[in-house]
Amino acid sequence: MPAAFPPDSVGLVTPQTAHFSEPLALACGRSLADYDLIYETYGTLNAQASNAVLICHALSGHHHAAGYHSVDDRKPGWWDSCIGPGKPIDTNKFFVVSLNNLGGCNGSTGPSSLNPETGKPFGADFPVLTVEDWVHSQARLADLLGIGQWAAVIGGSLGGMQALQWTITYPDRVRHCLAIASAPKLSAQNIAFNEVARQAILTDPEFHGGSFQEHGVIPKRGLMLARMVGHITYLSDDSMGEKFGRGLKSEKLNYDFHSVEFQVESYLRYQGEEFSGRFDANTYLLMTKALDYFDPAANFNDNLAKTFEGAKAKFCVMSFTTDWRFSPARSRELVDALMAARKDVSYLEIDAPQGHDAFLIPIPRYLQAFGNYMNRITL
């Protein structure tokens, strides 16, 4: 990290923790008696509290979306390319809130937190969560911060699903919804990928039925495999071909099953190794189930247009040409439903070779379109 922060950075940020003691009823039929949500804010809330923007994170995301926690940080927050002075989500204009969702493993109450009833980590006993549960908890955070209505709720992938759910559950509290590289529900193939990832974790002997913390271990192999499978789906065939091709790590083949021979193998193992050291296995299970369960149209006889009839927000939907995890066809399905419901909707399909992860990458056309939409939001 250079001695001075870039001029378009939000600079040093300090996470804050909000404690909630009012029980939160969950879709699974259980409730949490009390819980914490860790969050960060960027920019300044105006006197009318009309410039607040909520950032909803994807599966492995967290509250640290922009800026730096220390001058020694090697990298800024995960969406730093989009949040800051003069960036698409301009902190000179907006007050930005980014949190780690309930069930997460970065400071909000989740499976790795201590269960006050037992004095041990919740582990697998932590209740299964849904996107709507998250939205309810986010609404409580908004209340705490004095935000009656969001100028915009924004998210990519699973974050986009949360943004969509906000317009359904709290239609009066969202003026703009930006759903990026997202979908109105998972396809069978997507559910299948999630199940393979879960089985990698569940069948790891070190998982111990979710109580691995009590045994002083982590299901590292299962987490690595889950991340490796997931990461393949976040990239496109073209981007993998361009980045790795059939390149070898050494000059010759070893003719065995143990060596890391291809560059792509090395990359996947690195991603799995890094992920297994920072992410909680039970949280991974929770996040993938929340993805699987998201299907708001199920409450409206599978009529997606009817699902959004009560929404009052304006919508911006963006997709990427090579995203096969949440393909442009899924975004167009959403756009068609919104138009059928007579909603104000903008749609852009961005030509990008990076696959699903493109929403995290500073692609010029993407940033320009993103910024142009945000500039049109009146406060």
Swiss-Prot record:
Its EC number is 2.3.1.46. Its main location: cytoplasm. Pathway: Amino-acid biosynthesis; L-methionine biosynthesis via de novo pathway; O-succinyl-L-homoserine from L-homoserine: step 1/1. The active site is at S157, D323, H356. One of its GO terms (molecular function) is homoserine O-acetyltransferase activity. Residues 51-360 form the AB hydrolase-1 domain. It catalyses: L-homoserine + succinyl-CoA = O-succinyl-L-homoserine + CoA. Substrate binds at R227, D357. GO terms for cellular component: cytoplasm. Homodimer. Transfers a succinyl group from succinyl-CoA to L-homoserine, forming succinyl-L-homoserine. This is Homoserine O-succinyltransferase. It comes from Pseudomonas fluorescens (strain Pf0-1).
